[in-house]
């Protein structure tokens, strides 16, 4: 008979004896437990607002399905962004072991890292547009900013952030040498975004560009995106018509230059034809002298001298002919360029005129106030924004202009903003190249070493609304987009380019921006009216989500999530603003007085 000590157990077990205490370790089914309990609640919130359904409705990926549906793999990656996973490899550790979390996001189970990467590499520009449709649909339904009255200006900050890669990298598309702060000889991509800060914390969208690109190259696309999300600002038809007339006048000037170049080409051809005729005469004379030298050997020497004279003149004509041909080619290129500029200006004038005459439906405009750094403070940008009806405060592009303006300000005109900064209105001066009268506010900053530097602000805000000092302080409030850059770069890890494919990286960028807005909406829905109202997204992702929870289904129509009572975030979430259990979903109503400071 077999000894009981030799019987194999059906349950794996390990023990450790320490003095009189035995520590026992076994394996058990933990499918009901998750370590990110509030991420479960976010999955339910996403289901409520239709986020998974929107992905399945708008995005169509043709990929052979073996274990996972392609959209399920895309949603798995999206959840990893919300969870703050820095790399796709984190999915296997942070998400895949928790089936209850997957079910909260309407997924049978989370896909693995390899499956997610395969789907990301299959994305095309059509899929990027489809993800943009998901973004637009959810933004229209859930945006906090869009609930503001249309006559209250929405403050939109625009900025660019560099996504650096290794200088030796050759496999990241669009990764080029460019300007990246605090580094030299760096490669990467440029990410430009439009962001609404204050109590909203919503990114309207953004674009990727090669490392050498400037934000001015992306500004037309950003303006189109802003108006798509928020509707158009009230356009200034009179300014647009004036702009169209200026463009038409410039087009006529370029057309006149093109006609002048073409006339010069005709003149050069006439001169060339005359020189060629003279060159033929000299060639004929040389041929005749050569024949006479053969017939009259005694006069060959004198004939050779005359022949050399004709040959020298022939060489001179040929040199002039080559110079004329080069001049004709240069004039032809200039004429082509003038015609191209003429066509472009006429097309732009036509578009501006159409925009000026296009009727705007009542109630479809919104006041939009743009803030931007010196990258946007060019004459063309200022003119464009003014004509399209935007309010704006921009930092001037050229510091030399600031130094020139400093000579025009009297000592009594300076107003103190703080102990290191003073400002003054520059009266009677226009921005060079801009046909409109705008406010120029000169700022003088003194650092700790008593070094003085100047910059200036350009704005169309009336001085009655924002005084000199108030305008400077208002511009300095654009630090909110700097905080956004840190969050999307270092919390949602947009800086970690997941692939070398630009299309996949573009799709990742869109989903990261959508994840940012979803976190903002979730924070408002979960914590409005609680001590954690206005919780920073960094704190929410890195601390707030990390609540141990158990998910059960006591009834087919009841899902219960038990959150750890030791977590203050769980306590605030469950208690709700009225301190009652079973708090229904909060309406997304913007409260401009948050209880907590935001990063």
What are the functions of these language-model segments?
Residues 64-143, 149-151, 196-203, 213, ...:
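Short, positively charged, Gly/Tyr-enriched micro-motifs
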Residues 180-260, 264-267, 271-274, 278-281, ...:
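Electropositive, glycine- and tryptophan-enriched low-complexity nucleic-acid-binding patches
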Residues 11-21, 25, 234, 238, ...:
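An anionic, glycine-rich sequence signature occurring as long contiguous blocks
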Residues 119-196, 285, 292:
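Active-site-proximal, Lys/Arg-enriched surface segment
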Residues 32-76:
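Basic, short loop/linker segments at the boundary and entry of helix-turn-helix/winged-helix-like folds
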Residues 45, 91, 96, 376, ...:
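Short amphipathic alpha-helical "interface-anchor" segments enriched in bulky aromatics
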Residues 243, 518-599:
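A short, flexible helix-boundary coil/loop motif
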Residues 58-65, 467-475, 491-507, 523-536, ...:
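Short, solvent-exposed helix-loop connector elements
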